[in-house]
Amino acid sequence: MPTQVQMRPLLRIFAEPILLILIFLFTLGAKGEKVLQETFLGLQEAPIHDLGDLRLVPSRLDFGTWSVGQARSQTVTLFNQHSNRTLQLNAVAGPSPAFYSSFLGTREVPPQGNTTFNVVFLPRQLGAIAADLLIHTSFGQAELAVQGEGSECPYRLKPLVGIKAPMNATLTPEIHMYNPHERPLQILEIYSSGGEFQLELPSGGSEGPQNLWKIPPHTLKPVIRISFHGRTAGNHSAYIRIKVAEQELDIFIPVEFEILPRHSVYARNPLADFGRVATLNAPDALQFKLDVRNDESRQLFGSYLRQIPGLSFDANNTSIVLDASLFEGDEIINDLLVINSNQSSTSPGADQPFTVLVRAEIFHGGLTFDRNATRFVTTSPEGVEGEPLERKRSLVVRNKFAIPLMLFNVSLTEPIDESILEVTLVGDPRILIQPDESVELLRLNLLNDQVPFKSFLRIETNVTVFKLPLVSCSGRLHVSTQPIVLNFRQESLEKAAYNLELDLGTVPFAEMSRDGFVILRNDNPVPVRITNWFFKHPKTVYSQSTFLGCRATAIGHPVSVENDTKGWHLCTEIRAGESAVFKVAIQTYEADATFGTLKVWTPYEVIRVRVKFEASVGHLEIDQEQLSFKNCFPGKMCTAVLSIRSSFTHPVHVKGISFALPVGLRFKDFNAKGTTIAPQTLTKVGRIYFDPASVCRNNCYIRESTNDLAIFPSVPGGGNGNSGVINNNLLYDGVELRQRTELFRQLRRQLSSMSLTLHSEELPPLELDFSITIEWPKLVQFQPIPPTPAIEVGQVQRQWITLTNPSQSPLLLDYFLSDPAFARRTQLSLPHEVIDVSSTSCYLTDKEVFSLPEAGDPILLPGGASLTIPITFSAQLPEKYCTLLHVRSNLTLYEAVWLQARAVQSQFRFGNRRPGAASPLLFEMATNQFQGCQSGNEAVVVTRSFTARNSGVIPIRIEGFLIGSLPCEDFGFKVMDCAGFDLGENEARKVEIAFSADFTTSAVKRSLTLLTNLTYDISYKLLAQMPAESVELCASLLVRPGWESSLKNAALVVLLASFGLVLVAAVFDAKAIMVQQNAYDAARNKGPLQPTFNLRNIVKLQAEEAAAKAESVQQQQKVKNGQLKELRKRTVVNSTNSKSKSKSSWSPWSMDMNALSKHLQKAKPKTVVSTPVTPPAASAPAAAPVPLPEAKPVKKSSTPSPQGVPISVQVRPQKKVKPTPAVVLGTTKPKQEVSTPVADQHEKSLAKSSPPQQENISPKPNKPPEQRVLKEQNGSAKKMGKTPGRERERERRSKDQKLTNGTGAGVGFRKPERKQRQKLNFGQTTNSTSPPESPDALKCISNPWETSSRVSFRDVLRTPQMAPTDNGFDWNHATSSSDLGPIGDNRKNATPPMVTSLWEPLSATASNSLFANTEVDFITPDAIYEQREREKPQWEQRSDLVMRQQLLLQQPQKLEFQLRQQEKISLLANMDPSNWATNWSPLGYSTWPNATAGIGVMRPPPGLEQSARQTHNLAQEQVSAGPASGTGAALHGESLPTQYDPFTSPSSIWSDTWRQSSQRNNHNHMN
C-alpha cells in the first residue's frame, strides 16, 4: 500500500495497459482534433466509388452508459477489399472530445488485407452523446457512427475544464472524492499524465500517513491538490488517474487550463466546490474565499455565464457567496465565474479576465429536529424558579426533502462517556424516510449534569451528511478584569482568574482616568444571550461605560481598542469561544476612595463587577532622553537607565516594575530594597535590559546564518556563473535583504510604543509609556569625506575607512568596490537602511579611479574589533566621481557606502604666467643703475615683486624655491623671503626676488623652481639683462686680488710638469705591456694542451695511418715505373730556377690569389732547404713524388693551417712585379694537348707543390734547419687584415717590379688587364710569417666568411655537377661553383661560365701557388698550353740533373721517412683541439676517397665524410679532352691541400693572438 502520492513519469503510463495510452493521446482535445481533421481534409480525395472497397466492422459503435470519469474502449476492424490497390490509412478524428481513436501515424493495408484501431469513450458530462468519427484514407473519407451515454460518477468526480488564467499564474485546485460504499475506500495510486501538472497533498506536502489515503464510508474528502504554473500561453491538458482498491478500478479526471498571453490578476484556487447543500440545514450563507494574487491595486467585479439567484461574488472580500435559502428548488450548479478588473477592455494594456469554476448541488428541504432535545443546560436563572432539568429526551427527525431520504449511519464525532450520557439507537440503523415523514432516531439520557460535554451526531444520508449538536453546559460566563491595557491573548485569557472587581487605582483628581476592561468569556458550547447591562456610580463621580462588542479570543498580541477595530462585531449573544468586552472610565471629584458597579444580565445569571478607584494629585512619567538604547539590534544585549520624574507632593516607594511585553525586557533596581522616588524631582530608579532577539524570535532581521551561499553569493541573480562577466554590484541576495529590512521596520514600529507598570506602596499600578529605538547595525559608522575639498588631477589620494564589528561575536566580512564596467548597466534600488541616501546626486562612475590596494579574501573580524582599509583615488580628468564600497557580512548581509571625490586642475600663476611659460621673469637694468660701481659702491642690485596666485580650488603649499639647483639663491638671483607658505582657494601672495650683478656677463639666465605639494614642480625662467658697456666698465674698475698672478704662474708650472711625467709614464707602461704580452704568447704555446675529445681527431689518425701505408706502396710503384727520372728532372729544374731567380718570400695573407702570387714572385730563395711539413690529413710524407687523385669540391681553405714548425728561410729584397691581369676561364675553347706537355706540366707542378724532401736538395751544402719561434706557429707574427697603407705600399711595389709572364708570347694573344680587386689582407710581413704547409691550401675556401663580404652561402653552396673524368681511380669530378668569382672581385667582369670547384688542389704551376715560378701564371687552358711549349726545352735540359739528384735521394730515404714520422707525432701533439676545420659544412659532397695502394692520402675539407669522391682539378680539366696514360694521369694529381681553420690557424681573424699579430704587422709596415 503506497503511503505517498505517486507522481510517475510519462514512461509509467506507457507501461500500463493499452487503455492508458489511448487516454493520454486524448489530451489533444477537441480543438486539436478539429485542426488535425482540417489538415487531412485538405488532402487529395479519391473518387467516391473507391469507398466501396472499404468495410468497417462493426459499422456502428454503441458504448452504452458509463459514469463520468470512466473510459471504455472498443476495437474497429478496417478491411481493404480492393484486389490490387494498397490502402493508406492517414488519420481517425472526430468532433467530440468524448470519443478518440488510438490510431498513430500512417498505416498501409495491402489488397485484401485488414487492420484494427481502438476507439475510446470517456464521458465528460451527463446524458447521451453521439458523433461521427472521420476516417481519412487514400480511398477517401469514411465515417463511423459512435454513441454513448454519460451517467453520474458515484465518486462525485468531475472534469476540470474551462479554467482561464494569465501568464505565470500558479493554480492549485483541490479534488474531492466521495466514498459511496459501506466500507472504507482505499486509494492505491494517483498520478498525472502531464509533466506540467504536479501533484501534492491538500496540506501542501508530498507524503502522508496511510489513513490519509483512506476515505470513510459515505464521506466526501479532499484527496489531492494539483499544482500548475503557467509558463507558456496556450491550452494545457492532462489526465489525473486515480487507482482505487475497489475492483482495481481506474478513474480518470480530464484537466484543461488555458493560459492567457499577458500578466494579470488571478486566483490560485480556481475551483469553488460547495458540495451538496440542503437549504434548511445550511447556515445563512456559505462563503468560498478566493486566494487572489495581484501586483497592483485593482477593483474587481465578477459575472456568471448565467444568472443564478443565491450565487454572488463579493468583490470587497474576494469571496463567492452561496445563499441556499434563495433557491426555490433543486439546482445543480456547474458554472464559470468570470472576474474582470476596473481597467478598460478597449485599452491596449487591459487586463484579461480570469475564470473560476463554481460547483454546487442544491437540495431544497432538509432534515429537521428539535434543537432543545440535544441541548442540556444545567443552570437556571438567578432568582427564578424554573422547571427541573429534563434528563431523558427523544430525538425525532423529519424529512423535508422532495425525495426519499436514506439514513446509512448515525455516530458521534466526539465520544461521550456512558456514565455521563446514555445514547440509544431506535430501530435499524439503515432507515428510509419518505418525504414529510418523521422518525424517532435516538433516545438520550443525561446521567451526570455536573460534567459539561460537547459533541455532534453525524447522520450519513444519500443526500449529504448532517451534524446535530449534542451538548451539556452550565450557561455561565467567565468574568475577568484588566485595568489600563486590554490583552486579548488566548493564553492570558485562559490563565485569568474569575474576578468580579476592577481596581483602577489612583486616578487624577477631576480628570478622566484610564480605561478599565471587563471581559465576559463564553466557554459553553452553546451561545449565551446578553439580555441587559448597566453601570451604577456615585453622585460625585462621572463615568463612561461602553460595550465594545464581541470577538474571538485567539489573538496573539495586545489589542488597541482605538486603533484596532478588526474582528469586533456587535452581538446580542456570545457565541461559543467568543468574549464580550465592556470598557469603563471614571472622573472623580472626591479625594476619598469610592467604587461603582457594572451589572450584566444573561438568561442563566446576573453578573456584578465592582469598580473601585481613589483620587490623587500628581503623576509619574519616564524621561525618554535618558532612556536611550544605543546601538541596539538583535544579537546584542541592550541596556539603558530608567529615570522617573514625579509631580506628587509625597515620595513614592517603588516595589517593582513589570512590562507589558512579556519577554525580552528585564528591570534591575539600583536599590535592592526598592528605590524611593523623591517628590517633584527626577530620580534614577534602575536599569532596563533589553534583548531584541527574544522579542522577534524567528523573525529577526539579524540572524545567525549558516548558508554561505546566501551571504556571499558567487553569481548575482542565479546567473550562469560565467567568471569575468559578473556584475559585482549585484553580489548580494536582494530578496533576503528586503525581507530583513521589512522585519526591521516592523520591529521598530512595535517597539516605538511600549509601556511598563510601576508597582508602588502609595499608588496603584501605574502604566508608564516609553519607547525603545533599535538600529540597523552599520559596519562603517561614518560617511568618509576627503581630507581636502578637491584632489588634483593625476594625484594619488589615499583615504582610510574603518570597519567595526558592532556585535560581540566574530564577523565574516568581505569588501570590494563597484566594477566600473557595469556602472551604466546597474540600477540600484537598495533600502535606506543599507545605503546612505543623502548622496542622491551621486552616480556610479564608469572610470577606474578608485582602487583597493589591499583587497583580498573574506576576513574574520572578532567581536568589537575594527579593520582599517585604504582606498586610493587618482583621476586623469577633472570631474566628480562616485562609487560604492560594497561590504558583505553575515550580520546584515550587505552594506553600501558611497565614496565620492572631485578631481580638479590646479590653477597657479606666478607673475601672471602659467607654469612652464616661455616668457621669462625679466630683470632689466638700465645704464644709470651702474653709476654706483663708478663711485666706489660695487653693489648693483635690482629687486622685483611677483604675485603667486592660486586661482583654483586646490590648496597649494609652496615648500620652497630653487634657483638653478640651489635653494633660494644662485648666480646673483635671490628670493628675499624663502620660507614656505600656503595658498588657499583664490588666494595670492607677493614674492620678492633680487638680482645682484657680478659684472662677468651682460645677460644671466637661470631657472626658478617652486617646490609645491602638487604632482609637479612649477618652473619659470629668470633673465637679467644689463648693458654690455656698463658691465665692462664696472668689471674693469674692480680691484683684482694680489695673489691672482702668483697663482696663475704656479698653475702653469704644475701643468707642464704633469705633462712631462705623463709622457715618461707612458713609455714605461708600453714596455711593460710588450714584455707581458710576449711572455703571454710564449707561455701559451709552451707545451701541448690536453685536446678535447673530438671524433675528427680520430679520423685524422686513421687517415694518417692509411696514408703512411699508401705512401710506402706508392714509392715502390714509382721505382718500378721509372718515375725517378722525372723526379730528378723536376729537382734539377727547381734547383736551377732557384739559383737564377730571386728568392720568394711569404706574402701577407690575402683572399686574392693573384695578389698572393705577385708577392711570391718578388724574390727567390737562395737555398731551398726546408723541413717537410706534414699536413693534418697525411700520415707521412711521400718518399717520392706520387700521383694524387682529384679532390672533391668542398669548402675552400684560404690559408693553410699551422700544423708543423716551419724552417726559417733567408729572404732577399723582393722585386716589384707588375700585376698580372686576370684571365677569365672558359673564354677560349680548351685545346687538345699532347701527353708530353701534360707530363712536363705535372713534373713542374709536382716539384713546386710537393713538400721539399732530401731528393730535392741542391748540390750546395745544406743549411742547418732553424726552429722558428713559437709565436710563428700560432700565427701571432702573421699580418692579417687589409689597410689603406698596405694597399698603397703594394701598389708602389707593383709599379717598380717587372713581371715576366710567358702567357703573353703567343701569336695574336693579348693578355687581359687584371683589374684591381678589393683584398682582405691581414698585413703580415715576410719576416713574421710562417710558410703554409701546402701552397694548394690557398685555393681551399672552407667557410664563406673566409672570403670577402660579397661572397654568401648561396655562392658557396651552388656547385653544379661537371662531367666525370676517369683518372684511373674511379673518381668523379666535383661540381664547380656557378658564380663565385675571385675573392674581392667587384663583379664588373663577366662571370666565367666554368670556374674551379669550391675545393681543388692548386697546381704548382698556377700563378697563385706559393711554390710557383714567378714567370708562370696559368689561368686559362690556353695560357697553360703556351707556357708548357716555351718551357719544354728547359725541362729536357734539367732532366739529367734530376737523375743525378735522385741517386743521392735514394740513400737517405729511409732516414727521411723516420724523421717525418717523428714530426707527424709532434705535430699531432701540438694540434689545437678546437680546430674548426673539422666542423661539418653543408657543402656538396658524396663520400671520401678510399685509401688505395700507391697513391697519397687526401684529407677532405671540413665537414665531409671520409669517402668523398667528388673532386675538381684544373689540370685534370685541361687533359680531360685528350687521352692520357695511366702514369701521366697519376702524375697529373697535385699534392694534398692543407685545410685552413678560420678560428685556430695562424692568420685567422678569430685566433686568440690575432690582435697582437695585427699590432706587430702594423708596426712593421710603419717601419
Curated annotation (Swiss-Prot):
List residues traversing the bilayer: 1050-1070
Region Disordered: which residues? 1112-1337, 1364-1386, 1502-1567
Q: Which stretches are tagged as biased composition: Basic and acidic residues?
A: 1284-1298
Recorded phenotype for the gene knockout or disruption? RNAi-mediated knockdown in fat body results in collagen accumulation in fat body cells and defective secretion of collagen into the hemolymph.
Give the Polar residues compositional bias ranges.
1247-1259, 1319-1331, 1507-1519, 1536-1561
One GO location term (cellular component): membrane
Which Pfam families does UniProt cross-reference here?
Answer: Ig_TMEM131_2 (PF24495), Ig_TMEM131homol_3rd (PF24502), Ig_TMEM131homol_6th (PF24505), Ig_TMEM131L_5 (PF24501), TMEM131_like_N (PF12371)
Please list the coiled coil stretches. Answer: 1096-1130
Lumenal side of membrane: 33-1049
Q: Which residues carry this modification: Phosphoserine?
A: S1201, S1258
Q: Which residues lie on this side of the membrane: Cytoplasmic?
A: 1071-1567
What the entry says about domains is: Possesses a PapD-like (PapD-L) domain similar to PapD domains involved in assembly and secretion of bacterial pilus components. The PapD-L domain can bind collagens and is probably involved in collagen assembly and secretion.
User: What is the recorded function of this protein according to its Swiss-Prot or TrEMBL entry?
Assistant: Collagen binding transmembrane protein involved in collagen secretion, probably by recruiting the ER-to-Golgi transport complex TRAPPIII.
Q: Which NCBIfam families match?
A: choice_anch_D
Protein's name according to its UniProt entry = Transmembrane protein 131 homolog
Name the source organism: Drosophila melanogaster (Fruit fly)
Please name the gene that encodes this protein. Tmem131
